[in-house]
Design a protein with these regions (language model features):
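ATP-binding Walker
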Residues: 13
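NTP-dependent small-molecule kinase module
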Residues: 149-226
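Conserved substrate/cofactor phosphate-moiety recognition/catalytic segment
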Residues: 23-75
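Walker A/P-loop
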Residues: 16
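P-loop (Walker A) phosphate-binding loop of NTP-binding proteins
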Residues: 10
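ATP-dependent NMP and nucleoside kinases share a basic, alpha-helical "lid"
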Residues: 74-82, 86-159
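Hydrophobic anchor at the beta1->P-loop junction of P-loop NTPases
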Residues: 7
Length: 226
C-alpha cells in the first residue's frame, strides 16, 4: 500500500507547481489533480462547479458539493495507493475548512466554519467505516502576501490567464489561510504535517525539500533527456 500525501497551503504558494514537478521527476507516483480539474475530468458526475459564494447559505451548499467531490478524490488516491504508488493530492478536504474559516471572519458569515467542521467529522467517520484510507501526510506550503502577488502575476502571464483573476489572492484571505494552517500545526500533528515556507525557495528547492522529508528519490535523467 502506497502513501497518500496531501499538498495544501495558501493560495499561489506553489501547490500545483509542486505536484507537476513531482509527477515529472519522481517514479511510481500517482497524482490526484485539484478539485476543479478533477471535476472537469469527471464532468458526468460534476457538470457544474459552484461559483464563489455570495452568502453564508451559498457557502454551506458549496461545502456539501465539495465534500462529495473530496470523497471521490480520496477514493482515487486510494486506487493509486493500492497499486503501490506514492500518491500526491493537489489540495485536500482541509481546503474546505480553510475557506470556511477565512470567509466566516472576512464576510461575517457566522456558522459556516462550524458547519464545515460538522461535515468534516461526517466525512472522516464515513471514510473509516467504508475502509477508505485517509492521508498519511500533509505538506503545507506557505508564502507571504507580497510573494503570492508576484507569483500570481507571473503565473497568469505564463498560462495565459487574465490579470484581473485575483479572487483568491486578497491580502486578508491569505492572512486567514496562514492563520488557519498555523492553528493546525499543533504538537500532536507534527508527525503528520510538514510546513514549508516557500518565500525564498525555487521550484527545484521545494521539490528537493519534499523528497528529503518523504525519503523519495528524484529520477536520474540521461543528458538532454529532461
Amino acid at each position: 500500500m502506497g502513501r497518500i500525501i496531501v499538498v495544501d497551503g495558501t493560495s499561489n504558494a506553489g501547490k500545483t507547481t509542486l505536484c507537476e514537478n513531482i509527477e515529472k521527476n519522481i517514479q511510481d507516483i500517482g497524482i490526484v489533480p485539484g478539485a476543479s480539474i478533477f471535476a472537469k475530468i469527471n464532468r458526468s458526475r460534476y457538470p457544474k462547479i459552484p461559483a464563489i459564494p455570495q452568502s453564508a447559505e451559498e457557502e454551506k451548499e458549496n461545502q456539501k458539493f465539495f465534500f462529495r467531490l473530496e470523497l471521490d478524490r480520496l477514493n482515487e488516491a486510494n486506487r493509486f495507493a493500492n497499486q503501490g504508488k506514492t500518491v500526491f493530492m493537489d489540495r485536500g478536504v482541509l481546503e474546505i475548512l480553510s475557506v470556511a474559516y477565512s470567509f466566516e471572519s472576512i464576510n461575517g458569515w457566522d456558522g459556516i466554519y462550524k458547519n464545515a467542521q460538522d461535515l468534516y467529522e461526517q466525512f472522516i467517520s464515513y471514510a473509516r467505516n467504508m475502509g477508505i484510507n485517509l492521508p498519511d501526510k500533509y505538506i503545507w506550503l506557505q508564502a507571504n502576501y507580497e510573494e503570492i502577488q508576484r507569483r500570481n502575476k507571473l503565473r497568469q502571464q505564463e498560462r495565459g490567464q487574465l490579470l484581473s483573476e485575483t479572487d483568491w489572492i486578497e491580502e486578508n484571505l491569505i492572512g486567514k489561510q496562514i492563520e488557519f494552517f498555523r492553528k493546525m500545526c499543533i504538537p500532536e500533528n507534527t508527525d503528520k504535517i510538514c510546513l514549508i515556507d516557500t518565500n525564498n525557495m525555487t521550484k527545484q528547492e521545494v521539490l528537493e525539500e519534499v523528497c528529503s522529508l518523504l525519503k523519495l528519490q528524484l529520477k536520474v535523467y540521461d543528458r538532454g533527456e529532461k
